[in-house]
Amino acid sequence: MKIGALAKALGCTVETIRYYEQQGLIPPPKRTSGNFRQYNEEHLQRLSFICNCRNLDISLSEIKSLLNLENASKQQAEEINRVLDKHIKEVATRIHELAHLRMKLIELREKTVSNDEDPMKLLLQHSGVKFVRLK
């Protein structure tokens, strides 16, 4: 399979695949007589795993560690779970922060609707911007 077909199958770019190859996340593919990269099923599966991990916001260095644990023993499975637990905590933190942001936005919207003041002034006041009177 050529790189364009692989990229299309994965829903990523050719540049992304080349980058992952440069970073050592996938083995270099064989080359055709015309010097084109020729990818196989192993590349497809490995890149699919990498893309799924990236969608979960797992860093490339962590993905590399996970790929090195391919034939996971019990100890290695614990390492995989450690990485996943870290990301679960990070996602929970982000969810909490986003929920807080959502509430602040709702409050601000309600104030702009129910207040006779200039909506832009209200927005700036709630953004933490300090007003200074110029003489």
Swiss-Prot record:
Pfam families recorded: MerR_1
Keyword annotations: DNA-binding, Transcription, Transcription regulation
GO biological process terms held by the UniProt record: positive regulation of DNA-templated transcription
Keyword flag Ion transport: no
DNA-binding region(s), residue ranges: 4-23
GO molecular function, one term: metal ion binding
Top-level lineage group: Bacteria
The keyword Cytoplasm is annotated on this UniProt entry: no
InterPro entries named in the record: CadR-PbrR, DNA-bd_dom_put_sf, MerR-type_HTH_dom, MerR_fam
Domain HTH merR-type stretches: 1-69
Gene3D superfamilies the UniProt entry points to: 1.10.1660.10
Function: Transcriptional regulator.
Protein name: HTH-type transcriptional regulator ZntR homolog
